[in-house]
Amino acid sequence: MTRLGIAAFALIALVVGAQLVPVTRTNPAIKADVAAPAEIDALLRRACYDCHSRETAWPWYSRVAPVSWLVVHDVEEGRRELDFSAWDAYDAAQRAKKLRESADEIAEGEMPPWYYRLVHADARLTAAEREALRAWCGAEIARVSR
């Protein structure tokens, strides 16, 4: 067997073996979703909820290692940073901070991340949609800061 053949066999064995490493793809119970106008709710669900809620639509590739490890990690990190399904768990100051950070990241084009938009065309936001989300964040910050 040639070196190339051995390397190919080792790579295949590694990929097959990686499938045996379990990952936990969960959608915990929803505590209370964020209340937003219908237009904003639709944008949030389309572009944010897969990582920032407990309503993740797990794609087929979330079942194939090593990509599954990255997807699960991103969802867990997203929920830690901002979980729209646990909105009531945040006090007013936390909500204002999370909304401020969200508005900044949306304005800078950091959210949704480029690699998510690459495989989720529906998560690509137009300039008008970004502005609508930023305006809603600003209005919510004002509302919760009273």
Outline where the language-model segments fall.
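Hydrophobic membrane-insertion alpha-helices, especially the h-region
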Residues: 5-21
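Electrostatic cytochrome c docking/interface patches
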Residues: 24-44
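Extracytoplasmic/secreted proteins, especially bacterial periplasmic and envelope-associated proteins
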Residues: 39, 43, 66, 70, ...
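The canonical Cys-X-X-Cys-His
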Residues: 44-56, 111, 133
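Surface-exposed patches in mature extracellular/periplasmic domains of secreted proteins
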Residues: 55-60, 144-146
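Short cysteine/histidine-rich zinc-coordinating motifs and their immediately flanking basic loops
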Residues: 60-66
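Extracytoplasmic electron-transfer domains, predominantly the class I c-type cytochrome c fold
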Residues: 69-119
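C-terminal capping alpha-helices of c-type cytochrome domains
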Residues: 109-110, 117-145
